[in-house]
Amino acid sequence: MRKTVIVAMSGGVDSSVVAYLLKKQGEYNVVGLFMKNWGEQDENGECTATKDFRDVERIAEQLSIPYYTVSFSKEYKERVFSRFLREYANGYTPNPDVLCNREIKFDLLQKKVRELKGDFLATGHYCRGGADGTGLSRGIDPNKDQSYFLCGTPKDALSNVLFPLGGMYKTEVRRIAQEAGLATATKKDSTGICFIGKRPFKSFLEQFVADSPGDIIDFDTQQVVGRHEGAHYYTIGQRRGLNIGGMEKPCYVLSKNMEKNIVYIVRGEDHPLLYRQELLAKELNWFVPLQEPMICSAKVRYRSPDEKCSVYPLEDGTVKVIFDVPVKAVTPGQTVAFYQGDICLGGGVIEVPMIHQL
């Protein structure tokens, strides 16, 4: 008897190709499932989720597979969006994609998969592992690898997950879609955070977190060099949006004092204070047993390079991460993912002092 695989379909080319490949294999009963988390409208006033669902319908009809839709909008706002706002208001820089994977896609969506009597869940993530029992590894396309975004998802939640695109390059996925005549073959990839869309980040955030004007201070001179509209708008290492003129070198956000509502900057992209030798990480998730110390590499942002480091477990359940070479713009609230080669060991949330000591 053939097993059933539920394909998480977003209306994009990646999940369309996943459904196509699984149907073509002939080994599974393939069922599409569209998940609505946010009701954002585009510049024409049309809900983008409605347009995406229309594309899911077209692909499902092309492939002759049944499809369903489920809305997690309420749960998304409670478990992802509200935390996102709370963290930003407190000066942190959270990663909502990591939260969404843990709280929605591989928790609530998995419950729906079981309701539909699915044996497997398949997604369009560019990573490897899951149902093959190996935990989680990078996808082979270095420009598309998404293991970073899944580093906070428990191993058990991935135990029935198929990642058909993990061994493919994006160009190959596009080619397959075009050769198969899939309706989404030329559809642009979605970028950015789903609930922000194409809007500038500041204009989005100010709808939910009130402006709070304060001083921008040069950390080295302790002189006021400008004004800001809210310390929560700025993240460590940020250059754009400071609106400070008359400086020989570009200015970068060094740290923030949320209590006093001060943003500290330094001048020059290689200013030594922008670099940290160590960090603490909390809310940890591991795919492998934690050894002491664990010699590995870490990514402190999605697009940052791998940094060699040693990881030491602490009694309170956090870990101390010591880098071989100081790392630039380590940001409290961001996700850190740990690797040995292509294998993702796990991940956590960065916890470093928000205020530099004088």
UniProtKB/Swiss-Prot annotation:
The active site is at 100 (nucleophile), 194 (cysteine persulfide intermediate). ATP binds at residues 8-15, 35, 124. Its EC number is 2.8.1.13. Its main location: cytoplasm. Residues 95-97 are annotated as: Interaction with target base in tRNA. Keywords: ATP-binding, Cytoplasm, Disulfide bond, Nucleotide-binding, RNA-binding, Transferase, tRNA processing, tRNA-binding. One of its GO terms (biological process) is tRNA wobble position uridine thiolation. It catalyses: S-sulfanyl-L-cysteinyl-[protein] + uridine(34) in tRNA + AH2 + ATP = 2-thiouridine(34) in tRNA + L-cysteinyl-[protein] + A + AMP + diphosphate + H(+). InterPro entries: MnmA-like (IPR004506), MnmA-like_C (IPR046885), MnmA-like_central (IPR046884), MnmA-like_central_sf (IPR023382), Rossmann-like_a/b/a_fold (IPR014729). GO terms for molecular function: ATP binding; tRNA binding; tRNA-uridine 2-sulfurtransferase activity. The keyword Cytoplasm applies. Disulfide bonds join 100-194. Residues 144-146, 301-302 are annotated as: Interaction with tRNA. The record marks 125, 334 as: Interaction with tRNA. Pfam families: tRNA_Me_trans, tRNA_Me_trans_C, tRNA_Me_trans_M. It is found in: Cytoplasm. Belongs to the MnmA/TRMU family. This is tRNA-specific 2-thiouridylase MnmA. It comes from Chlamydia trachomatis serovar D (strain ATCC VR-885 / DSM 19411 / UW-3/Cx).
